[in-house]
Amino acid sequence: MYRVVYYTDKRGDSPVEDFIRSLQLKARAKVLKWLELLEEYGPDLPRPYSDSLRDKIRELRISHSKLEVRVLYFFWKDKIIVLTNGYFKKERRTD
């Protein structure tokens, strides 16, 4: 099993944790459920839940209602997943 940790800067702020807390209750619950899946499956979590971006950065892909939520993360040391930030995807990629 993997362990999810939230990136925290020198001041103790965690942008990704703040982002997740800012979501509406149902969207937040879905993100937390996807994080449980990520802890269980790690790098084997398939699409549509997770996808590789570049330079070992991955994204957790959550669709809720009309929202497309993304949480970026990477694997660090032995079975640690570091969540770095979150955002709303606005458009489909065209390339």
Residue ranges and their predicted role:
Residues 71:
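Portal/gating segments that form or line small-molecule/metal binding sites
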Residues 1-68, 77-81, 88-95:
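Basic, Lys/Arg-enriched alpha-helical interface segments
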Residues 74:
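Conserved Hanks-type protein kinase catalytic core
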